Amino acid sequence: MAKQDYYEILGVSKTAEEREIKKAYKRLAMKYHPDRNQGDKEAEAKFKEIKEAYEILTDAQKRAAYDQYGHAAFEQGGMGGGGGFGGGADFSDIFGDVFGDIFGGGRGRQRAARGADLRYNMELTLEEAVRGVTKEIRIPTLEECDVCHGSGAKAGSKPQTCPTCHGAGQVQMRQGFFAVQQTCPHCQGRGTLIKDPCNKCHGHGRVEKTKTLSVKIPAGVDTGDRIRLAGEGEAGEHGAPAGDLYVQVQVKQHAIFEREGNNLYCEVPINFTMAALGGEIEVPTLDGRVSLKVPGETQTGKLFRMRGKGVKSVRGGAQGDLLCRVVVETPVGLNEKQKQLLKELQESFGGPTGENNSPRSKSFFDGVKKFFDDLTR
């Protein structure tokens, strides 16, 4: 079976420059790579053709021979003896560029790992959350060794270049037709080895410590808010950047107030005479007591809004409100005189369901009467 033309395989003209050939190869190799087409024999065969064409057309000597003699230039007895395209080509460059991010290859020394991020759960009272507070916290962490300054090597020595990968952090492994780069098993990709480890950190470059931090909590935070302290996480390996510390806010339940966004809610009990006749009562706010005027004929559950007495948003903007929900209390512990007065009051209303003085009761009982009338029809 005749072999396909190398230029046709890559989809380029016979006058294509090397950069065009390389670009075409990258595109096709990405499409037909075996790792992206597992179990697809046709894709695997196509990938081999693409690699063969790329190797020939990016080698000036081989390309010239191919242009003059075609595939015959590489058959037994042709150019270079031995034929084929198995000798000498190093695909580490193209593989690093094309497949590094996708298949974990890539070139060069593995970067030292950034330090891990840490999390701290901080409980605040409502007052602390609303006004802001500065608190000291203690957190266990890994810090850079102060003896070797993160290198892991004993004082007076330094890490040595890995003899296996010669400092590259990777080694090339040939698996049949393919040449694959892998992390160096000797140095784990660092490119260096520590022959004389530091006596304090034993070569790790980091030591366990508990550090104390002063954390400023801004006014207006709420449960679920998270504060990031850059660089206050664990130290990175061998001089790599430190991680971050995230302070997670949890606001404790308050005895009086409930928070909803930037608004505060509280229940204000009033007796039935104030509800009926109106009056004035002191209610609590986070800034102290204020006076609330209750109009006559106030029903239980009515909300009174006190503007600007809520929480100032941590992100700026208008301050929230305080909403007072009145609860009309039924009197208890009545003496005989009080009971008699209430009976007289009830009679003046025209009975327990006085129509003129209890509109909701009238509406309710009218509805009940209609319901039963409809049932008996």
Curated annotation (Swiss-Prot):
Cofactor: Zn(2+)
Swiss-Prot/TrEMBL GO biological process terms: chaperone cofactor-dependent protein refolding; DNA replication; protein refolding; response to heat
Alphabetized SUPFAM superfamilies for the sequence: Chaperone J-domain, DnaJ/Hsp40 cysteine-rich domain, HSP40/DnaJ peptide-binding domain
GO CC annotation terms, alphabetical: cytoplasm
Functional summary from the UniProt entry: Participates actively in the response to hyperosmotic and heat shock by preventing the aggregation of stress-denatured proteins and by disaggregating proteins, also in an autonomous, DnaK-independent fashion. Unfolded proteins bind initially to DnaJ; upon interaction with the DnaJ-bound protein, DnaK hydrolyzes its bound ATP, resulting in the formation of a stable complex. GrpE releases ADP from DnaK; ATP binding to DnaK triggers the release of the substrate protein, thus completing the reaction cycle.
PANTHER family: CHAPERONE PROTEIN DNAJ, DNAJ HOMOLOG 1, MITOCHONDRIAL-RELATED
Name used for this protein in its record: Chaperone protein DnaJ
